[in-house]
Amino acid sequence: MGLPWYRVHTVVLNDPGRLLSVHIMHTALVSGWAGSMALYELAVFDPSDPVLDPMWRQGMFVIPFMTRLGITNSWGGWSISGGTITNPGIWSYEGVAGAHILFSGLCFLAAIWHWVYWDLEIFCDERTGKPSLDLPKIFGIHLFLSGIACFGFGAFHVTGLYGPGIWVSDPYGLTGKVQSVNPAWGAEGFDPFVPGGIASHHIAAGTLGILAGLFHLSVRPPQRLYKGLRMGNIETVLSSSIAAVFFAAFVVAGTMWYGSATTPIELFGPTRYQWDQGYFQQEIYRRVGAGLAENLSLSEAWSKIPEKLAFYDYIGNNPAKGGLFRAGSMDNGDGIAVGWLGHPIFRDKEGHELFVRRMPTFFETFPVVLVDADGIVRADVPFRRAESKYSVEQVGVTVEFYGGELNGVIYSDPATVKKYARRAQLGEIFELDRATLKSDGVFRSSPRGWFTFGHATFALLFFFGHIWHGARTLFRDVFAGIDPDLDAQVEFGAFQKLGDPTTRRQVV
């Protein structure tokens, strides 16, 4: 046939049996990839430190999605929360991976069967005997079935009525666990950070889908609408399906990048806006202030800060710090976090407490500037020593650590003070192991960044695909050169000019 690569799908355009076959094969590939990827991630995943080396630091992509749906245990005897277990049950990480691979194999066989037995009676129009699909009826069937699945997920799986529930955490990603969720039917259900909205929206959308499916099964479209929207053309199905997919891809790119109840920070890492807004820093200071109000010493108050919370307040966990073409996990960048060194508090010789200005997200380098509580610059690390007025040496800056591994340690030598001032630009200070993975010290993005980039990019491509195929199906007659208002039966090849009887070809 000699088709160019971008036209090869025309071979299934008027062949319902093989059109079904290639879609089943596509499902086999997707499911097989998911199962295989899960097994690969489980082979390289280290569950030993869920606080400082969580799944998102290790670049896990499919494990977070399994976890948010209620899978927490492994046949290897470990739990995602860090404990050990003896009876993980069939629906472990490996069980889900195996189920996907098994389903992939069954789809593979089904695809082969439908490719071989393509000419089935069900695909034929009784009146003409030619291949034909009742597309509005098929639409109704699919809408009805997807409505049942959507309703069932919201009413049973998420609520824990028949299922595990979903991953639910606090606003600071400290207490996350799988639990059942009650539907939120009030205005709070529209808050993207309220888990109850997931249950209520699936129940509502599923109910609507069931009713809409029954409507499309029982009511035929008007003839004018049927013809106007080209409902008899399979390319209309392709165009509208692409629209649904690219719309969903844009939505999930947004919920992933900006954060929501569906993308917990314990599973996907924090968002860039939490660094930009000093979200975790404010909570840490609030907790320290509350500790001081309870007559704790500064050291005791900082020692009560959870290591997990301090780790979120580190720029290396910002997904926007990864660069284009920097492949690999966060651990391959700045290294595996080993421990929190503590919170450094800088003071000059006059006793002013100094704060290091933090690096904004899109800077690779940033001047080291120390300001007091009023925002007045008191010290810095100068670019030109000859012109310096506020250098660490001149101002006599010291640093003392509170909490963490260096709790109570004071440094006064300028070289060490400057070292920790530079590191304080990046948030809380952690000891990082760069030797184990030969980490190069260049920040990487988290799975949150990869997911957003991938889905936003493909959504844009699919948007153009929707326009392309929508235009092809709506204006097919124009592209083919056939006047839709031409009532006379046209015999192709009879005239030199299509439909013009004055140009009848001469029979030789």
UniProtKB/Swiss-Prot annotation:
InterPro entries: PS_antenna-like (IPR000932), PS_II_antenna-like_sf (IPR036001), PSII_PsbB (IPR017486)
Annotated membrane topology: Multi-pass membrane protein
GO terms, biological process: photosynthetic electron transport in photosystem II
Location relative to the cell: Plastid, Chloroplast thylakoid membrane
Gene Ontology cellular-component annotations: chloroplast thylakoid membrane; photosystem II
Keywords: Chlorophyll, Chloroplast, Chromophore, Membrane, Photosynthesis, Photosystem II, Plastid, Thylakoid, Transmembrane, Transmembrane helix
Cofactor note: Binds multiple chlorophylls. PSII binds additional chlorophylls, carotenoids and specific lipids.
UniProt xrefs under SUPFAM superfamilies: Photosystem II antenna protein-like (SSF161077)
Pfam families according to UniProt: PSII
Transmembrane intervals: 21-36, 101-115, 140-156, 203-218, 237-252, 457-472
Coarse class of the protein's main subcellular location: plastid
The organism's place on the tree of life at top rank: Eukaryota
UniProt-recorded Gene Ontology molecular function terms: chlorophyll binding; electron transporter, transferring electrons within the cyclic electron transport pathway of photosynthesis activity
Family: Belongs to the PsbB/PsbC family. PsbB subfamily.
Role played: One of the components of the core complex of photosystem II (PSII). It binds chlorophyll and helps catalyze the primary light-induced photochemical processes of PSII. PSII is a light-driven water:plastoquinone oxidoreductase, using light energy to abstract electrons from H(2)O, generating O(2) and a proton gradient subsequently used for ATP formation.
HAMAP family: PSII_PsbB_CP47
Subunit structure as annotated in this protein's UniProt entry: PSII is composed of 1 copy each of membrane proteins PsbA, PsbB, PsbC, PsbD, PsbE, PsbF, PsbH, PsbI, PsbJ, PsbK, PsbL, PsbM, PsbT, PsbX, PsbY, PsbZ, Psb30/Ycf12, at least 3 peripheral proteins of the oxygen-evolving complex and a large number of cofactors. It forms dimeric complexes.
Protein name per the record: Photosystem II CP47 reaction center protein
Species whose genome carries this gene: Phalaenopsis aphrodite subsp. formosana (Moth orchid)
